[in-house]
């Protein structure tokens, strides 16, 4: 079974320099995987009186994404029905959201979250910002392709019709996924020049030359920008984040802050987002679910360690305190353990 799957994977990845599943993911491929058996067990769980949610959660959260795609295929072949719609009828609430999210490929998931953030009245800017600011070039290019496939329109077109001004310019530039890749050569002259340009375009003058900020922050590689933000402190009395707070407001401020934090330390950025989703009264489940689903195979172990370091208690502990039932169980499986 796996060999056929491996061949299919290789074929679909040709010309796509895909990184191997991350060593820092909390969800790994299940060793004794059998798509047919999983599909059958899910089918039985759905038909059980009152729905056997535990079995569904156990299977879906303990398989990696490629394996879930095999289960979707096997289920369809077995029952002539789509697994997603069967589970949609069987489950409800936040648990349904988690499980349906896990059945999509990463790009389908991001594309559907982006579409949802721009649908109907008003835009959910926070979701738009989080996804667009935190994905790699390769991820963004795949999202653009899948978005067009799913919605018969370009992601860029939807962003343009849903946003305005400099915020729109920043989102459009980021969504292209054309940031320079990490070079092996460190260009100290350019680092210094960029740091000075960011200062000259903002804190140093009256008003802000936002296009200058956008071009540097969306075109340069991440390691380069990390050094630029360090160098920036030798020109400006404020660090980059403080400068943003002083210079711009609203969605644009929010977007630049997210972008800089994610450039400085991506796992810490997600740890902060997770903490914010659970602190105080009530839970921002949409954010919690999206990060747990989308980072579980990427960098969840790094996120967990940043979370514990900064907030003193584990992410696992926070999820336990903040959620309940099978929804909680699903999130804890994705978290992958206590620290």
From Swiss-Prot:
This is Putative annexin A2-like protein. It is found in: Secreted, Extracellular space, Extracellular matrix, Basement membrane; Melanosome. It may cross-link plasma membrane phospholipids with actin and the cytoskeleton and be involved with exocytosis. The modification N-acetylserine is found at residue 2. A pair of annexin repeats may form one binding site for calcium and phospholipid. The lineage of its organism: Eukaryota, Metazoa, Chordata, Craniata, Vertebrata. Calcium-regulated membrane-binding protein whose affinity for calcium is greatly enhanced by anionic phospholipids. It binds two calcium ions with high affinity. May be involved in heat-stress response. InterPro entries: Annexin, Annexin_repeat, Annexin_repeat_CS, Annexin_sf, ANX2. The gene is ANXA2P2. Its main location: secreted. GO terms for molecular function: calcium ion binding; calcium-dependent phospholipid binding; cytoskeletal protein binding; phosphatidylserine binding; phospholipase inhibitor activity.
């Amino acid at each position: 079974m796996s060999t056929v799957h491996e061949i299919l994977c290789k074929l679909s990845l040709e010309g796509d320099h895909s990184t191997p599943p991350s060593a820092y993911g909390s969800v790994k491929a299940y060793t004794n995987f059998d798509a047919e058996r999983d599909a059958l067990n899910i089918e039985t769980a759905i038909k059980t009186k009152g729905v056997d949610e535990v079995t569904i959660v156990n299977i879906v959260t303990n398989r990696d994404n490629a394996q879930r795609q095999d289960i979707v295929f096997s289920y369809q072949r077995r029952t002539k029905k789509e697994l997603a719609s069967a589970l949609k009828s069987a489950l409800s609430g936040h648990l349904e959201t988690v499980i349906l999210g896990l059945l999509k490929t990463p790009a389908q998931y991001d594309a559907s979250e982006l579409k949802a953030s721009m649908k109907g009245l008003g835009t959910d800017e926070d979701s738009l910002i989080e996804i667009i600011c935190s994905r790699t070039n390769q991820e963004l290019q795949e999202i653009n392709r899948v978005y067009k496939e799913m919605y018969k329109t370009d992601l860029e077109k939807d962003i343009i019709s849903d946003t305005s001004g400099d915020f729109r310019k920043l989102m459009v530039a980021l969504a292209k996924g054309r940031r320079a890749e990490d070079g092996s050569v460190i260009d100290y002259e350019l680092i210094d020049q960029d740091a000075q340009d960011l200062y000259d375009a903002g804190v140093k003058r009256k008003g802000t030359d936002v296009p200058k900020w956008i071009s540097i922050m969306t075109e340069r590689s991440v390691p380069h920008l990390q050094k630029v933000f360090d160098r920036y402190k030798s020109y400006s009395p404020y660090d980059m984040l403080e400068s943003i707070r002083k210079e711009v407001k609203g969605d644009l401020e929010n977007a630049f802050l997210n972008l800089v934090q994610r450039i400085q330390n991506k796992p810490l950025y997600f740890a902060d987002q997770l903490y914010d989703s659970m602190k105080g009264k009530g839970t921002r489940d949409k954010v919690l679910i999206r990060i747990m689903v989308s980072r579980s195979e990427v960098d969840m172990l790094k996120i967990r360690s940043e979370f514990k370091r900064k907030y003193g208690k584990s992410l696992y502990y926070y999820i336990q305190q903040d959620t309940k039932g099978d929804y909680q169980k699903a999130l804890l499986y994705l978290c992958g353990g206590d620290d």
